[in-house]
């Protein structure tokens, strides 16, 4: 009887920890609408935002994520912020996105864009964007810097873009 009691208690504790673990991680992937994302990146701060649009099922996207993470780590003490905006479905946060983030050990901030109408949200990011991913917007509003890329980016190109913003800052 004691053995069954101990097993039942262990199961209950395990389930409680499992639920707590899952809940805390789901809070680490904020679900945003395009208006929320735009408010975040279109403020007048002198922070340079590197906003990468990707998905767990997109092979070129997955291949470039380590470069974005490297940039995020290198510039962690500077006014450079990498935002990895996944285009996965919000219903897949726990089943796909979180396990992916943990498996890849992503350092950068991950957000989920909860939009289904591409005709609505795509032009709000860039009129140049067809909707294909990977896509990246690099923006610094204080210095009128805005570059959009609809392709896989390399570490070298990301570093060059950041240096371009920094040179504008030094000129002012």
Residue ranges and their predicted role:
Residues 1-32, 165:
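Bacterial Sec-dependent N-terminal signal peptides
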Residues 28-48, 72:
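A short beta-strand-turn-helix
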Residues 65-86, 102:
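Conserved helix-turn-beta segment immediately C-terminal to the redox Cys motif
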Residues 134-172:
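Thiol-/selenol-based redox modules, centered on thioredoxin-like
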């Amino acid at each position: 009887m004691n053995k069954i009691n101990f097993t039942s208690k262990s199961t209950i504790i395990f389930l409680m920890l499992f639920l707590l673990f899952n809940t805390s991680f789901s809070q680490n992937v904020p679900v945003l609408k395009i208006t929320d994302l735009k408010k975040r990146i279109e403020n007048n701060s002198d922070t340079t935002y590197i906003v990468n649009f990707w998905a767990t099922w997109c092979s070129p996207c997955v291949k470039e994520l380590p470069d974005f993470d490297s940039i995020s780590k290198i510039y962690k003490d500077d006014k450079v912020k990498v935002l990895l905006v996944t285009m996965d479905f919000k219903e897949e946060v726990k089943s796909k996105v979180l396990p992916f983030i943990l498996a890849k050990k992503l350092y950068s901030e991950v957000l989920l864009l909860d939009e289904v109408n591409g005709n609505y949200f795509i032009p709000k990011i860039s009129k140049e964007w067809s909707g294909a991913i990977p896509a990246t917007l690099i923006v610094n509003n204080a210095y009128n810097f805005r570059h959009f890329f609809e392709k896989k980016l390399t570490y070298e190109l990301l570093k060059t873009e950041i240096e371009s913003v920094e040179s504008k800052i030094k000129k002012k």
